[in-house]
């Protein structure tokens, strides 16, 4: 079995990284834009009704090409993530995950990309698929978690450029990692072994395993915490989306216990929770692999290989998440964001930290950007970013903390930076 799934493969080229920040945008890129409202009336359990289109004027694209470079391993880059935990006055820093490396870049305010660190896994056969940022609770040093084909989670101390934690438990590849939004020591992982695990990276214990009786029946491809860190949404190859709660008394007790647990002083292993039953589950949203999911308040954004991101809500529109009934798979579709030529899996969209802008690439190097109206997600401004040198599959996009920089990574080992033309996106 190949270590990289068929849709993840790309030609290997042993070329050195080259920075292209001096190239002229006028000669290298074309950008098509429009402002549209593509929505579907809310329909229970995936009931589809005709779309409504609003008339609006075209406007300039929000982002402009700045530069790109190519990493010297020449293989596909599957993951990219900005460090949103840094202050407003600190440099914008992001990481890429591809081959057996994680590269850390700085985005200077004047433009360009600056490589500041490269972590190479000791296993040359490793292929990293994902990365996520946190920090050390004792030293405040930035920490980067990464994982992939080998199923081993590495937690890297950026200041020391070395792994300070290695977590083995998943039986197969790990497709995505996410840190808890409020507790920096809690890490979530979703795997090819059909399971999701919650870890405490401070005490190195596995707090919970989500899966089993009513868990995913195939690879878990994407996971996400809600903003309060009380619920988890997961999606996978089984076409399903599942909601898991971690705000119950049992979970709160185990999370608290994990903070002080010392395996060297305990005669028994940590009592890991085995959670077999999700709070909610549905297969009515998508008909193919669901490879990306993120919370949008109490709504959910998810995508499959169907040229559409779906905004939906578990249960009926009037219900809160706490009012969901067990074994009730009903859901309400709020809106759809359509795009072209992205019919392969493991292509993930990016959400800016304040949930106002979504960006997704396709298999031919184009990136679609939607600016959402917080009061009504059915009304959006959309634009398409395109550079004639970018022709490879765009695997993932990411926004800086203030959304002034958009980066994406491709199958040909390239990293692209685009800058916002103005400062209309405000942070709290």
UniProtKB/Swiss-Prot annotation:
Residues 1-19 have a biased composition (Basic and acidic residues). It comes from the Eukaryota. Residues 1-61 are annotated as: Disordered. Keywords: Developmental protein, Nucleus, Phosphoprotein, Repeat, Repressor, Transcription, Transcription regulation, WD repeat. The keyword Ribosomal protein does not apply. It is found in: Nucleus. Residues 45-61 have a biased composition (Basic residues). WD repeats lie at residues 72-115, 124-166, 169-209, 215-254, 285-322, 341-380, 389-427. InterPro entries: PcG_WD-repeat, WD40/YVTN_repeat-like_dom_sf, WD40_repeat_CS, WD40_repeat_dom_sf, WD40_rpt. GO terms for cellular component: nucleus. Phosphorylated. Polycomb group (PcG) protein. In contrast to other PcG protein, it is specifically required during the first 6 hours of embryogenesis to establish PcG silencing. PcG proteins act by forming multiprotein complexes, which are required to maintain the transcriptionally repressive state of homeotic genes throughout development. PcG proteins are not required to initiate repression, but to maintain it during later stages of development. They probably act via a methylation of histones, rendering chromatin heritably changed in its expressibility. Component of the Esc/E(z) complex, composed of Esc, E(z), Su(z)12, Rpd3, Caf1 and probably Pho. This complex is distinct from the PRC1 complex, which contains many other PcG proteins like Pc, Ph, Psc, Su(z)2. The two complexes however cooperate and interact together during the first 3 hours of development to establish PcG silencing. Belongs to the WD repeat ESC family. This is Polycomb protein esc.
């Amino acid at each position: 079995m190949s270590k990289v799934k068929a849709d993840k493969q790309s030609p290997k080229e042993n070329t050195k990284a080259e920075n292209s920040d001096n190239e002229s945008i006028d000669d290298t890129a074309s950008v098509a834009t429009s402002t549209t409202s593509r929505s579907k009336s809310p329909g229970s359990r995936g009931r589809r009704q005709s779309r409504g289109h609003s008339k609006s004027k075209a406007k300039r694209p929000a982002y402009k090409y700045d530069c790109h470079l190519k990493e010297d391993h020449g293989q596909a880059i599957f993951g990219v993530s900005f460090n949103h935990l840094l202050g407003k006055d600190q440099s914008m820093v992001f990481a890429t995950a591809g081959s057996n490396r994680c590269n850390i870049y700085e985005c200077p305010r004047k433009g360009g990309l600056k490589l500041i660190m490269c972590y190479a896994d000791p296993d040359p056969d490793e292929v990293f698929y994902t990365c996520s940022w946190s920090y050390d609770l004792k030293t405040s040093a930035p920490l980067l978690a990464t994982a992939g084909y080998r199923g081993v989670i590495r937690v890297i101390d950026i200041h020391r450029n070395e792994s300070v934690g290695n977590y083995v438990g998943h039986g197969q590849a790990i497709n995505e990692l996410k840190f808890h939004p409020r507790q920096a020591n809690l890490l979530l992982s979703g795997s090819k072994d059909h399971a999701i695990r919650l870890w405490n990276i401070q005490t190195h214990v596995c707090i919970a395993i989500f899966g089993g009786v009513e868990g995913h029946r195939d690879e878990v491809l994407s996971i996400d915490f809600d903003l309060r860190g009380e619920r988890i949404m997961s999606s996978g190859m089984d076409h399903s989306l599942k909601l898991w709660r971690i705000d119950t008394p049992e979970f709160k007790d185990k999370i608290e216990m994990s903070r002080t647990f010392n395996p060297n002083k305990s005669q028994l292993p940590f009592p890991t929770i085995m959670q077999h039953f999700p709070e909610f589950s549905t297969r009515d949203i998508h008909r193919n692999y669901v490879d990306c999911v993120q919370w949008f308040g109490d709504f959910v954004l998810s995508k499959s290989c169907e040229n559409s991101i779906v905004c939906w809500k578990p249960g009926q529109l009037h219900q809160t998440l706490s009012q969901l009934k067990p074994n009730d798979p009903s859901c309400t579709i709020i809106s759809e964001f359509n795009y072209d030529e992205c019919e392969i899996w493991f292509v993930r969209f990016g959400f800016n930290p304040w949930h106002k802008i979504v960006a997704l690439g396709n298999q031919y190097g184009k990136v679609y950007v939607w600016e959402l109206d917080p009061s009504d997600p059915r009304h959006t401004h959309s634009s398409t970013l395109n550079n004639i040198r970018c022709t490879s599959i765009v695997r993932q996009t990411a926004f800086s903390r203030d959304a002034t920089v958009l980066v994406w990574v491709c199958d040909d080992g390239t990293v692209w930076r685009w800058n916002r033309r103005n400062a209309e996106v405000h942070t709290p």
